[in-house]
């Protein structure tokens, strides 16, 4: 009733206590790589193996039927701590060295194709991945700039990062507004310098193709953490969040141009 949609975070790695791990292990579709979280025996799955992609989706089916609208495919590089010999490992499609840059593409492709194949499905597939490559847009997938720190330098770097990304053919991109990790001002919402950085980032974020606030504790995510009505940092952020909602007809029209007229990157990252 409030036009709220649900996106959940799903990873490409599994721990040995999970049913996914056990099923993937039976078909030899787990990489012997160390990944996050460390020292827990967690392994990425072989996204190049179509049977492995089938298994991955099988465990998402119930969530999809419950009404999950989109997928946050985090750790899609995968989050891999490289060691000697990893590059020579043979995946389903060849050596890890030869195919690893296509890992996020195949991971997201598997999710997209399985969702679209669901009986009676009329929902568009939407995925946000931390890492990507040419062709992601074909599978309803976009990226953000990853887990960045909270600083003016980092915010400045996001501008060319976004422009370079969309010019590669994937028009939707975003950044963690305010930064993901703590930076030069800590995480004190009463610090005027931190307020200034957060507010300016929120103002800029209002005009990105996708607007998204995201951080890691103890950084601050919620508007109410920045004060109350009448406080500068609260009021300005609220104003631009509301402006974003008023811009939705324009944003939706832009999205139509991207799809129907192939105007790559026309979404507000370039306008």
Task: Please provide the spans of the model-predicted regions.
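Catalytic-domain carbohydrate-binding cleft regions of carbohydrate-active enzymes
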Residues: 1-270
């Amino acid at each position: 009733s409030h036009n709220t949609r649900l996106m959940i975070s799903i990873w490409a790695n599994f721990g040995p206590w999970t049913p996914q791990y056990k099923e993937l292990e039976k078909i030899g579709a787990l990489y012997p790589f160390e990944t996050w979280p460390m020292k827990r025996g967690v392994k990425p799955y072989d996204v190049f193996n179509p049977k492995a992609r089938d298994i991955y989706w099988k465990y998402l089916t119930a969530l999809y039927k419950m009404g999950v609208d989109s997928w946050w495919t985090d750790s899609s590089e995968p989050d891999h701590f490289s060691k000697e010999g990893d590059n020579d490992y043979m995946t389903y499609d060849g050596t890890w060295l030869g195919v690893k840059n296509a890992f996020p593409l195949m991971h997201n492709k598997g999710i997209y194709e399985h969702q679209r194949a669901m009986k009676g499905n009329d929902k568009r597939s939407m995925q946000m991945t931390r890492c990507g490559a040419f062709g992601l847009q074909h599978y309803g997938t976009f990226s953000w700039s990853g887990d960045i720190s909270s600083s003016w330098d980092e915010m400045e770097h996001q501008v060319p990062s976004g422009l370079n990304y969309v010019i590669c053919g994937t028009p939707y991109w975003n950044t963690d507004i305010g930064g993901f990790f703590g930076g030069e001002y800590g995480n004190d919402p009463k610090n005027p310098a931190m307020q200034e950085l957060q507010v300016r980032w929120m103002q800029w974020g209002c005009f990105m193709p996708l607007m998204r606030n995201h951080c890691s504790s103890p950084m601050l995510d919620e508007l109410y953490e920045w004060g109350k009505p009448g406080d500068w940092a609260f009021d300005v952020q609220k104003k631009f969040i509301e402006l974003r909602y008023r811009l939705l007809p324009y944003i939706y029209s832009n999205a139509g141009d991207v799809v129907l007229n192939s105007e790559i990157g026309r979404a507000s990252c370039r306008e």
